[in-house]
Amino acid sequence: MESRENQYCWPKAEAVYPDRPGRSYVLKRLRYRLRAFLHRGLIAQFEQFINQHPFLVKLLNEHADYSYPLVYRFLDKRFNSKKRFQAICENLLFLPEKLTALSAPIYKTPLSFGEVIPDFEMTLSMTTHQPMEGYWVLELWHKPRNELVYLLTFAKLDEALLISVVQGPNFEGSKEMVKQLTKTGHGLRPAYLMVETMKALTKALGFKTLLGIPQKYQNKSRFIQSSHYVVDYDAIFAESGGQLKDYWALPLELSLIHISEPT
């Protein structure tokens, strides 16, 4: 019989929502159990799929929250359970399979693209944020303070890549940092820097189509803990040259239209 370490089983509610000092997650665990019960057939298929890939067994056993999107939401609020299953399975595999030449697997070690502008480093890695928004993320770090400034989460959707999240900071002094970043980037605002970087990555990975999630179908992010900070995805994608159909279709040519004088 295989040991539990070498086998994946759907995680228990306590693994996804453990109680913390001063906080109880009883209701969240109840919702989790109900959703799991309603999707028990899908969960059985998912367990079978994961157990065919040893590295995914270890990965999902270490990250209990990576499984939850299967029975809740993943990428697009319109996805039904079948589409979530297909998209999750595909996205867990596609980037590790694309980047087999790396010395360390992308799901273990972030890939650094170096300083895209002085003091700011861009990395590609597996998410440590909300997996329902996608498993893969570009992150912009302020190196002197080792502080995450911006992120862009993306996923494979059929034969395209899909931007599902573009988020900025909400820590003390973040507004000044964004101004500094815009000034250092010769007027290129950080949100658009992330989109332009994603365009380049799309081509580097061999894809010909880059899409953006329409605002009303985007899963709510938790990176910014503020009800007063609203990211206008439709405006970002429109100003990046996107055309709205089912998704925003973005051109892969790099653009300079986002250059502006920081105020």
Q: What annotation goes with each model-predicted range?
A:
Residues S255-T263:
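Residue-level detector of conserved catalytic or cofactor/ligand-binding positions
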Residues L148-L151, A155-G242:
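Acyl-donor binding region in acyl/amide transferases
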Residues I213-K216, Q243-S255:
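Acidic carboxylate-rich catalytic motifs and surrounding loops in phosphoryl-/glycosyl-chemistry enzymes
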Residues L59-L60, R73, Y192-L193, T202-K208, ...:
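Noncatalytic linker/hinge segments flanking ATPase motor cores
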Residues E2, N80, S226-V230, S260:
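Short, structured coil/loop segments at alpha-helix boundaries
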Residues M1-Q180:
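Non-catalytic substrate-recognition and accessory regions of acyl/acetyltransferase enzymes
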